[in-house]
């Protein structure tokens, strides 16, 4: 069985959290799941086995930060390969899996899949000048919205918007599609090194240094503002950044 998780826009749609959610859902349902990614931003080429589930077998530099994070969160077999067909075959050979989640594969046509899931940021859909968006490299679109007809289900990520809303002009692209809604909700703060969990109120109003290194930093800042964390002092870095020693020292 194969499920593809992808999008039609550049960055910030919530694809990696959806990959983690789908993978854990399948794993908890009894499937032996493997995740295959191209390994965006990695410093290696070819096929790399990232994890067999119980341990990470490579460095974040060799596989890329997204699949590295997914492997830690899901504890399933995972691999990277720019050739998805060869990568899928090798991942099946090297691990006892019966289900593959293809990360960021909506534009890839060479592997037959049982379901194509596409996640879209609702704010992008509702932008008034939406139809002026251009295809890469001139704009934000990987492909036209007409391509959604290939999808089996669409996940509308409303993030912090109060309700699901689709622009009237856009509704024709969503007809006869299964539409699901995703949103963000802060639950707690976690010290990942010491594995200590803190209540949201523990940081309420305190002076903080906020560090972000994701495609859509505003969504992260919105989370903190919603739980009354002071975000005045912040360091905003680009997505997939390799941090220098000077930057790490600055954060500390």
Give a label for each model feature.
Residues 1-3, 109-112, 187-189, 194-196:
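Signature of alpha-helical transmembrane segments in polytopic membrane proteins
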Residues 27, 72, 225:
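Anion (oxyanion) recognition and catalysis
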Residues 31, 75, 229:
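Short phosphate-binding/catalytic loops that engage adenosine nucleotides
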Residues 34-36, 118, 208-211:
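Conserved beta-strand elements of the Class I
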Residues 40-42, 46-174:
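Phosphate/Mg2+-binding loops and adjacent switch elements
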Residues 125-252:
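C-terminal accessory "lid"/substrate-recognition subdomains
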